[in-house]
């Protein structure tokens, strides 16, 4: 059994309980009213679940925007539904920092004690603590594989039980919670009056508690659960037990950020009751009119034609590990980018193939443009003024889209339109290979396309060709020399000179084995993820993603 001595809340508890910090101005809003913060205006208008409209995103500090993210309950492998939510918020975080100059301090809570964890641990005949550690590490590995940036800090519930106890004590002292004879502690929703329901506008009602519970009102929710046989427990003034679900996030967020939080995020299914109850707890604890300024919610990942949420309870899920065996994280990220983070998204092979096709087209354009810049792709003049103008319009369109509730759909469309026009210019240039070349504008277009995808976490340039290989630069040079040597052999085999008809035919026949060897080398390299393209008078090469055979241009 677990036993942790109760400690006082310490300085953080006094600081957090002082109430609202200065620097908020009143603003008209629906229902309970929303207080528009003052501070650093990011330049973004974001859909705020508190107001159900797009509000200016104003954070307390540009160099330390506070963001709390609900983390996983670690009892099993994470699935694509989880991946979709975390990837979408990772994209937003990257955009905030890399486009709008806002340094994000993100904290993620890890629920490592819970009914599901206890039940699964009993099924596997292991301790809840060891099970939770196993799947916590599994979750972190999945996030790294998806290229989701880690939060500034992960905080486990089990390592903050004393602070949770102190938080509950203050709620009781403030008249917002009560202890029962059975040793349970509940939040008294009646004490909030009409201030409950800020987020989703629902009236208090019974949520997930047994009918025969010892609550005063059916709508009250558990802050502390009395210990049961064969379950982990901690000591408290009300007897042995463990924390309820909602109080965990409220305590952890307050521990780090105090009485004011800039951004709170999670899946749309967490809006009620979880986030609604967090708001009630924190505003009762801090005695403030507004604790969290912006609540962002991501839509579900749906299967079966959009009618069913992907979830473990419905047994219709695909684990992240299984998915990544056949699909690259870049394809999945582009799949997520092609819908609003707030909307439900249908999981289908068709949608993934479309994302893969777009990534392939972008990678091919970048490689062709680089070949043109290196002089390996024959080409003539490009309509520079047209391409420069399109590049400027694209940059402005991307900036405007991202400032409008992180509209990645419009941003991706704008970039793909630029790629389309760049391809058209390259094709026209290759059809008329005479005249002056125009590499500068194509270089600027490639840099802009790569910058956008790097900003949102999609890799177009894979610097390491083969896993476990030595220096990527050395390998690059080796392949470059090999392709150059092959090109010379191929050009020699195809050259007929001034020989007459029969002599020319005989010469080509004699050199046929050289062409066959060149083709064999191309096939052999393709097996190892290197694709060679023979062009008129030149040959270029590119890397292939071994899971998808999509080209990945070299940096």
Curated annotation (Swiss-Prot):
InterPro entries: Cys-tRNA-ligase, Cys-tRNA/MSH_ligase, Rossmann-like_a/b/a_fold, tRNA-synt_1_cat_dom, tRNAsynth_Ia_anticodon-bd. Keywords: Aminoacyl-tRNA synthetase, ATP-binding, Ligase, Metal-binding, Mitochondrion, Nucleotide-binding, Protein biosynthesis, Transit peptide, Zinc. It is found in: Mitochondrion. Its main location: mitochondrion. The gene is CARS2. Belongs to the class-I aminoacyl-tRNA synthetase family. A motif ('KIIK' region) lies at residues 116-119. A motif ('KMSKS' region) lies at residues 309-313. Its cofactor is Zn(2+). Zn(2+) binds at residues 70, 249, 274, 278. Mitochondrial cysteine-specific aminoacyl-tRNA synthetase that catalyzes the ATP-dependent ligation of cysteine to tRNA(Cys). It comes from Bos taurus (Bovine). GO terms for cellular component: cytoplasm; mitochondrion. ATP binds at residue 312. GO terms for biological process: cysteinyl-tRNA aminoacylation. This is Cysteine--tRNA ligase, mitochondrial. GO terms for molecular function: ATP binding; cysteine-tRNA ligase activity; metal ion binding. 'KIIK' region and 'KMSKS' region are required for cysteine persulfide synthase activity. NCBIfam families: cysS. Its EC number is 6.1.1.16.
